[in-house]
Design a protein with these regions (language model features):
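Active-site-adjacent bridging/hinge elements
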Residues: 27-28, 89-99, 119-130, 165-166
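Acidic/His metal-coordination segments adjacent to aromatic residues that form catalytic metal sites
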Residues: 96-104, 129-139, 169-171
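Conserved helix-loop functional segments at active or binding sites
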Residues: 59-66, 92, 122, 126-133, ...
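Active-site recognition of the HExxH zinc-binding catalytic motif
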Residues: 107-127, 148
Length: 185
């Protein structure tokens, strides 16, 4: 909490700048909190996006990259939106099989690539718990979100290395929006 409190002035400054950019003089309305400031014009097919995630994971840990590769090759992910499919994304862990299943509503944007990294982070976290007893595998949300947010950071930092100026704005805005979501939750 101390790190969040310490960085709140920067978050507030970002929100003031965003409000001004979007034309609001009296602060940013809640409904504009996650409004994009630039369009994400880069297309990331699931194949391209998931391979990018794997490549970035491998720069940190071959085990992490292998986990993501295994999940994709074994069709552990329900990737695309379709009629009557629930929205959002999540990771469901199947303890008895020592496996995870992933639900995405992948839309070919950078934010979808980050969502894949995030949820693979949840799955990898559970994989690392391995043969722990059930009592050791229940944890509070801040611990549960640590691995997933860390995986987002790995992929985001990797993406910045080769991004165009517009893509850099998309990546940084996505990072800030995710940080704001954590703070608001």
């Amino acid at each position: 909490l101390s790190v969040m409190k310490k960085n709140m002035p920067e978050i507030r400054e970002y929100l003031k700048i965003k409000a001004d950019y979007l034309g609001y003089q009296n602060g940013l309305p809640w409904f504009e909190l996650y409004a994009p400031v630039v369009e994400d014009d880069e297309e990331y097919s699931f194949e391209k996006g998931s391979q990018f995630v794997i490549d970035q994971f491998n720069t940190f840990s071959k085990h992490l990259g292998d986990f993501a590769t295994h999940a994709i090759k074994n069709h552990w992910a329900d990737v695309y939106p379709r009629e009557n499919k629930v929205g959002g994304a999540f990771c469901e862990n199947i303890r008895s099989l020592k496996q995870s299943r992933f639900l995405f509503n992948y839309g070919n944007h950078f934010s979808d690539v980050i969502t894949v990294a995030h949820d693979f982070g949840h799955g990898f976290h559970v994989r690392c718990l391995g043969d722990q007893t059930i009592l050791n595998t229940h944890y509070p949300m801040p611990i549960g979100e640590t691995a997933s947010n860390f995986c987002e950071t790995i992929v985001g930092k990797g993406a910045l290395k080769s991004a165009t100026p517009t893509q850099k704005i998309v990546i940084l805005e996505n990072t800030l929006s995710n940080a704001i979501q954590v703070i608001c939750d």
